[in-house]
Amino acid sequence: MAISPEFLTSTLGFTVGDGDTALAVGSGSLPVLGTPRLLAWMEAATCAALEPVLQEGSTSVGTRVQVEHLGASPVGAGVEVSASSAYDDGRLHRFTVSARDTATGKVLAAGEITRVVVDEERFMARTVG
């Protein structure tokens, strides 16, 4: 059963800390929000959007990411990340994601993240070598 796309939305707020910087996560040499951390925050928003509709024993896994990191955020900056369903077929969910600076409203990143709903046990059984 497909779920109404406008129902699957989530917005999360974060403050950039020292451990979130490109320098700290190894993706650069500057003390600004690192792209890997920003992407993790955006994925967390997609997970939060899907959580209320997942059946017991199910979870979702990321399968595709297309994100542009458009602006730098210093330590102490507030960042709001949002995910909104753009497409779903019951298993596959494509989200439009964005991040903005909470003080200025400036768009920091935008793109799409795709997740697929899977059975937790069956998925993990396939990962055993």
Can you say where each PLM-predicted feature lies in the sequence?
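Generic structural detector for well-ordered beta-strands
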Residues: 13-17, 68, 114
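Intrinsic-disorder/low-complexity, polar/charged segments enriched in Ser/Thr/Lys/Arg/Asp/Glu/Gln
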Residues: 5-11, 64, 78-80, 92-94
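Catalytic strand-loop segment that frames the active site of acyl-thioester-processing enzymes
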Residues: 1-34, 51
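HotDog/MaoC-like acyl-thioester-processing domains
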Residues: 7, 74-75, 85-129
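Residues at secondary-structure transition points
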Residues: 33-37, 74
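Hydrophobic beta-strand-centered segment that forms part of the acyl-chain substrate-binding groove
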Residues: 47-80
